[in-house]
C-alpha cells in the first residue's frame, strides 16, 4: 500500500527541520538547521519527485515555516531577515536539482537520494576534511575552491551568515589564510536566484529524460 502523498511529503518536510529541536545549544540551532537543510534539500527533492509537481510544496513549506523565526527570533541567526529569502531560493534550487534527478530515474529515487546526501556531506566536509586532517589541510587556493562548491557555504552565505569566519570553518579549513582575491562570500542577491534557475533547468531536463526513458 502506497503512502498518501501529503503524508509522504510531510515526512520529507519534517526531516528537513528535525535538527532544530535536537540542538542542545539553542544559540547554534539556527545555523545547524540551515546546514542540515542545505544537505537535505537535494535528496528530499529526489524523493519528492515520486509525487510529481506536488513535491514542490516541501521547499515552499520550509520557507514559510522558517520565515517568521528567521526574522530576528531564531537563535544563531539574529538580524538575518531579508537575506533568508535568498537562502530559500538557494534551497529551492538544490531541491530542484534533486527533483530533476528523481524524475529522470523514478525507480532509483531511493538510491539516488542516498547518493546525493553522501555527495553533499562530502562537499561540506572537504574544506576541513571533517576535522580529521588537522587545521588547514589544504592550500588557501584549494580551500577557497572547496568552500565555493560546498552547498553549506552557498545556503548560509545566501542567508547572510559570515560562514568563512564561523568557528567550524575559520581555523579548521584555513579560511583565515584565504585572500579576498581567492574567494569572496556568495552574494545572495544573485547566487540565490541563479541556484533556483539551475534547479528549474535540472527539473525540466529530468522531466524530458524521464519521458524519453518511459516511451
Where are these regions (language model features)?
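Alpha-helical transmembrane segments
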Residues: 2-19, 56-67, 199
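Alpha-helical transmembrane segments of polytopic membrane proteins
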Residues: 4-7, 26-41, 80-92, 110-120, ...
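Alpha-helical transmembrane segments of multi-pass membrane transporters/translocases
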Residues: 9-17, 169-212
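Juxtamembrane "helix-exit" motif on the non-cytosolic side of transmembrane helices
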Residues: 18-27, 67-79, 103, 125-136
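Canonical alpha-helical transmembrane segments
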Residues: 37-55, 94-103
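Secretory targeting signals
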Residues: 60-106
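A structural motif at transmembrane helix-loop-helix junctions in multipass membrane proteins
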Residues: 93-136
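Terminal transmembrane helical anchor/hairpin motif
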Residues: 126-193
Amino acid at each position: 500500500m502506497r503512502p498518501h502523498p501529503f503524508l509522504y511529503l510531510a515526512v520529507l518536510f519534517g526531516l528537513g527541520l528535525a535538527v532544530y529541536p535536537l540542538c542542545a545549544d539553542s544559540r547554534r540551532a539556527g545555523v545547524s538547521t540551515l546546514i542540515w537543510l542545505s544537505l537535505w534539500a537535494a535528496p528530499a527533492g529526489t524523493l519528492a519527485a515520486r509525487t510529481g509537481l506536488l513535491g514542490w510544496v516541501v521547499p515552499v513549506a520550509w520557507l514559510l515555516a522558517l520565515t517568521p523565526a528567521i526574522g530576528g527570533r531564531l537563535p544563531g541567526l539574529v538580524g538575518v531577515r531579508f537575506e533568508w529569502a535568498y537562502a530559500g531560493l538557494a534551497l529551492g534550487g538544490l531541491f530542484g536539482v534533486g527533483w530533476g534527478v528523481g524524475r529522470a530515474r523514478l525507480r532509483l529515487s531511493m538510491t539516488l537520494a542516498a547518493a546525493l546526501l553522501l555527495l553533499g556531506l562530502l562537499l561540506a566536509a572537504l574544506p576541513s576534511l571533517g576535522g580529521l586532517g588537522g587545521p588547514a589541510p589544504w592550500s588557501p587556493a584549494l580551500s577557497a575552491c572547496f568552500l565555493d562548491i560546498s552547498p553549506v557555504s552557498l545556503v548560509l552565505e545566501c542567508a547572510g551568515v559570515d560562514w568563512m569566519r564561523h568557528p567550524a570553518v575559520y581555523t579548521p579549513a584555513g579560511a583565515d589564510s584565504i585572500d579576498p582575491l581567492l574567494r569572496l562570500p556568495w552574494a545572495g542577491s544573485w547566487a540565490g536566484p541563479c541556484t533556483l534557475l539551475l534547479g528549474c533547468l535540472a527539473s525540466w531536463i529530468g522531466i524530458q529524460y524521464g519521458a524519453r526513458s518511459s516511451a
